Amino acid sequence: MSRTTPICQYRNIGISAHIDAGKTTTTERILFYTGINHKIGEVHDGAATMDWMEQEQERGITITSAATTAFWSGMAKQFKPHRINIIDTPGHVDFTIEVERSMRVLDGAVMVYCAVGGVQPQSETVWRQANKYNVPRIAFINKMDRMGANFLRSVKQIKTRLGGNPVPLQLPIGSEENFKGVIDLIKMKAIKWKDIDQGITFTYDEIPSDMIELSEKWHQNLIESAVESNEELMEKYLSGFVLSEKEIKSELRKRSLNNEITLITCGSAFKNKGVQALLDAIIEYLPAPNDIQDIKGITNDKASTVAFRSSNDKAPFSALAFKIASDPFVGNLTFFRVYSGIVKSGDSVLNSVKSQRERFGRIVQMHANKREEIKEVYAGDIAAAIGLKDVTTGDTLCDLNQPIILERMEFPEPVISISVEPKTKADQEKMGLALARLAKEDPSFRVRTDQESNQTIISGMGELHLEIIVDRMKREFSVDANVGKPQVAYRETILNKVTDIEGKHIKQSGGRGQYGHVVIELFPLESGGKGYLFVNDIKGGVIPNEYISAIDKGIQEQLKYGPLAGYPVVDIGVRLYFGSYHDVDSSELAFKLAASLAFKNGFKKAKPILLEPIMKVEVETPDDYMGDVIGDLNRRRGIIEGMKDLEIGKIINACVPLSEMFGYATDLRSQTQGRASYSMEFLKYVEAPSVISDLIIQKRER
């Protein structure tokens, strides 16, 4: 079976926004207008198609990135059918990982902003992630029907807060309860959607007389933005020639694809106005897979040669697994983006990261939580595979004979932990399986067993993140668990370099003995919260090569539980430069134990310190409560980094230790009578004050 939609008619897009900007509602309207849903699902009644987890429907927020496919031929049926693969991403900061991995596999993004709240804190995080992966984007300013809606204020904030170059394609006709439609600034016509059929049909009308002057001003702005990078068209425009619609759109598309401008649309998804024109803009101004640069990777040979794959069905197959999800009926679903080539169900491919062969059992196209089985997928497709055994997020799947490893995704380290204990003996085994599966799905979630207490410790990106993990254990795996208080994920490191650190493991009491002897140097690495470097400087074969990896392994095992307070050790280098061995008694185990002893001894002499996670906190508060909010942040050992003015208040930026932020939401609510909001994300690890680290170490020693 050959490709039914040419690759130039594909659009792989993500829909991203701050929580409650109306992103899921916007996606629901897209599914309605593209003909997939016959009844519009509303978030507030728990019926939204894209929010398919029970927790999402209860809380009215999106947690996982649901993927779906839709087709669009234009509001006026002016295009050939375009295939739009949509990923709906969460707006809560605890689920930033979902946004990050979606951005990695997308070609374009739609940023949804609330016309009342404008650019809110999480919007900045999402914008930075789109910048990181160089994703072209357009904006949809939603909720134009709400009290306090202000389109031009939101446009200005995209420039001032995000550093974007916003160019409106439309102006709203009226706002709040008087919002009637939009003005198309290219055609210079008013678009009004009919309420009788939920906005499926529309009319082009003349621009209202009281808006002609404003429309002319923004029409000129649009044309000037279009011709700015094209000298020939600029001259033509300045000479008084009228540019054609085709010329304007072509230049806007080029500039949008180069990330030079962000085109702005507006509407009210809830009132069925504006999403239809947004769909047209997705097709006209966001890239097809063959518009973006060839994907970069390395060949998995010894030289690790840089290689590229183009969005072409004839190129060797390459794809990136960007999400693993558990399905109650088929087990693991592996979501993947095909960058080049074709793969059919039943084909064998290589997981080049793990050097393992995998077989595509079945391939399915996803529509939220519904599945449609398909036989093959092509370059540019996003689909899910059933039957892949050992694939994790970020792995590359590729042609067996032409291997490539695509650039990997980076995942943040968890910053908060809680202990979980099964309530009954029956829950014990089920809990292990449940946590293993959930950890496979989510790279920002970790599970470990505390060596001393033997408790199971789970770690994640925030309180809500872990709350939902515990909730999913109960709902999906029927595991009841008692949950401990949140704990901070501290780290350990050293400040000084120490040398001549010896580790000996010698046992010779009848029978075959054990002999391992190493001499190492420990040194601090640049701070970052995760580094480890092992340098083998053995000369003259004083320790045979076969034991070197065992020495490295022995040290790495010690890194998991630091000697200071049992927290992971980071930012440390180890140089192995001397030792000795015994022809008969030496073994890998003996050298592993000798290395562990040397590391423990050296760590204590190298001025060990505890590192604590610092969070970037952004609080939006009315002016009346500013003093109280700042005072409270100072009491929490926070450092105020700066403030920005809002029309009715301030945004306060601060850096605060995570250990001081537990229960902050409740405290902020009571301080400001519920009128302030905040967001928080991990920033960096820094040395904990001695009064804090002494307390933690004493607690550990008890």
Curated annotation (Swiss-Prot):
GO molecular function terms attached to this record: GTP binding; GTPase activity; guanosine tetraphosphate binding; translation elongation factor activity
Entry-linked Pfam families: EFG_C (PF00679), EFG_III (PF14492), EFG_IV (PF03764), GTP_EFTU (PF00009), GTP_EFTU_D2 (PF03144)
Keywords on record: Cytoplasm, Elongation factor, GTP-binding, Nucleotide-binding, Protein biosynthesis
One cellular component (GO) term of this entry: cytoplasm
PROSITE patterns the UniProt entry points to: G_TR_1 (PS00301), G_TR_2 (PS51722)
Keyword Protein biosynthesis among record annotations: yes
tr-type G domain sequence ranges: 8-290
Cross-referenced HAMAP family: EF_G_EF_2_B
Name of this protein: Elongation factor G
Organism, scientific name: Buchnera aphidicola subsp. Schizaphis graminum (strain Sg)
Gene name linked to the record: fusA
